[in-house]
Swiss-Prot record:
Keyword Acyltransferase: no
EC number: 4.1.99.17
PANTHER family registered for this protein in UniProt: PHOSPHOMETHYLPYRIMIDINE SYNTHASE, CHLOROPLASTIC (PTHR30557:SF1), THIAMINE BIOSYNTHESIS PROTEIN THIC (PTHR30557)
Pathway the protein acts in: Cofactor biosynthesis; thiamine diphosphate biosynthesis
Organism: Sulfolobus acidocaldarius (strain ATCC 33909 / DSM 639 / JCM 8929 / NBRC 15157 / NCIMB 11770)
Keywords of the record: 4Fe-4S, Iron, Iron-sulfur, Lyase, Metal-binding, S-adenosyl-L-methionine, Thiamine biosynthesis, Zinc
Name of this protein: Phosphomethylpyrimidine synthase
UniProt function note: Catalyzes the synthesis of the hydroxymethylpyrimidine phosphate (HMP-P) moiety of thiamine from aminoimidazole ribotide (AIR) in a radical S-adenosyl-L-methionine (SAM)-dependent reaction.
Catalytic activity: 5-amino-1-(5-phospho-beta-D-ribosyl)imidazole + S-adenosyl-L-methionine = 4-amino-2-methyl-5-(phosphooxymethyl)pyrimidine + CO + 5'-deoxyadenosine + formate + L-methionine + 3 H(+)
Length: 428
């Protein structure tokens, strides 16, 4: 029985109790929202992750970290270093490897990860076809489905499944005047398969079987946005919205069948459209968890897209987005190295918290209030240990040596908080 089915029967499981304690939400609210598909627990019952990661309505915003090899850079040691960084900063992890022994890499990443691991199975199908048959679109439907099942057996907790993309939508998008017709790698692979084979999306024609597979492992289907905007000029055009409408139908079918599901979102979105992007998705899908890539609010930010996108991510989180997929300084330019992965992860941890202050209020802001209290008292050790990155904060605090006065080296003896405390003493 899946977690959704248990919740519908009114069962408060140990996992629901753990979610309640972690997120400070009543067990009954958690149960009800799981039953409705508004909260999910990323997991694979055959291989549980070490970290409990509930995502959805009324819960803190989570962040996802993408790692993985490319056809140009295959360095397993570097990817495993990224796993360590992900364990420290992230909530979920996706292995997007496209180079090397994909099965071996995935299994090693899952073994080293404390987090639920996700994948995009069409990558492996396309790459295997390319290597064996000299063309990426030559894989059969059975080969794609067998890869999905193999990855579930390995312990994958969630997968991007581009089932909302129809053949007709793909053809129209490719013929359109979009700045960039398709930027989703997995989406483009599915589009290419449909055009080459003259068939409908294999995820759509095998949807019922996919539901059975995911239900067996109680894993999550992450409905990919193949036609997400890859330029702010393309945001919320007929193709993005058309796919979202198709996706919304699949969402309802998955939940009705007791399968956990979330929806992936853009992408590149102008600042003024970010909040209503979230609200539109929630309205169409009945409030299932929303997993957004950024979004980037400008197109010219590289190599600072982790900053440009964290602006959109904070707004999305505040508006109700549930899972933020990070970007790194290497986005649009290169495979990220380990340092860039950490920089992206920290930017998104900040964005998620900024959004949660709006979305969840005082219970989240308590952390900020504690830091501000210690800052006002110039209790540096206590303040620093509460910060988002205490180790780096201490390095910055002491970069010119230990301050000679109680204040930091910015204001020194002219620190307003130090003087305010003196004035308070005089006032009595």
């Amino acid at each position: 029985m899946s977690i959704i089915e248990e919740a519908r029967r009114g069962i408060i499981t140990d996992e629901i109790k753990s979610i309640s304690k972690l997120e400070k939400v009543s067990p009954e609210k958690v149960r009800k929202r799981i039953a409705e598909g508004k909260i999910m627990l990323l997991r694979n019952v055959k291989r549980p992750s070490k970290k409990l990661v509930p995502i959805g309505k009324g819960l803190t915003t989570k962040i996802n970290i993408n790692i993985g090899t490319s056809s140009e850079v295959i360095d397993l040691d570097m990817e495993l270093e990224k796993v360590k960084i992900s364990n420290k900063w992230g909530d979920t992890l996706m292995d997007l490897s496209t180079g090397g022994d994909i099965d071996e890499i995935r299994r090693k990443i899952i073994d080293k990860s404390d987090l639920p691991v996700g994948t995009v199975p069409v990558y492996q199908a396309f790459i295997q076809s390319f290597k064996k048959k000299s063309g990426g679109a030559y894989f059969s439907e059975d080969e794609l489905l067998s890869i999905v099942e193999r990855q579930l057996k390995d312990g994958v907790a969630f997968m991007t499944i581009h089932a909302g993309l129809t053949r007709e939508l793909a053809i129209r998008a490719l013929k359109s005047d979009r700045v960039i017709p398709i930027v989703s790698r997995g989406g483009d692979m599915i589009a290419g398969w449909m055009i080459h084979n003259g068939k409908e999306n294999p995820y759509r024609t095998n949807w019922k079987y996919l539901l059975e597979l995911f239900k067996e492992y109680d894993a999550t289907i992450s409905l990919g946005d193949a036609l997400r905007p890859g330029a702010t000029a393309d945001a919320h055009d007929e193709f993005q919205i058309g796919e979202l409408i198709e996706t919304a139908r699949l969402v309802k079918d998955a939940i009705n069948n007791g399968v956990q599901v979330m929806v992936e979102g853009p992408g590149h979105v102008p600042l003024n459209e970010v909040a209503w992007d979230v609200k539109l998705m929630k309205k169409l899908t009945g409030g299932v968890p929303y997993y957004v890539l950024g979004p980037l609010v400008i197109d010219v930010g590289a190599p600072y897209d982790h900053i440009a996108s964290s602006i959109g991510a904070a707004i999305a989180s505040a508006a109700g987005a549930d899972l933020l997929c990070y970007l790194t300084p290497a986005e649009h330019l290169s495979l990220p190295n380990a340092k860039q992965v950490e920089e992206g992860a920290i930017a998104y941890r900040i964005a998620a918290h900024a959004g949660d202050i709006v979305k969840l209020g005082k219970k989240v802001r308590k952390w900020d209030d504690e830091v501000s209290y210690y800052r006002g008292k110039l209790e540096w050790d206590k303040m620093i240990e509460k910060l988002i990155d205490p180790e780096q904060a201490y390095k910055v605090y002491t970069q010119f040596g230990e301050p000679n006065v109680k204040a930091c080296t910015m204001c020194g003896g002219y620190c307003p908080m130090m003087w305010a405390m003196e004035q308070v003493k005089k006032i009595g």
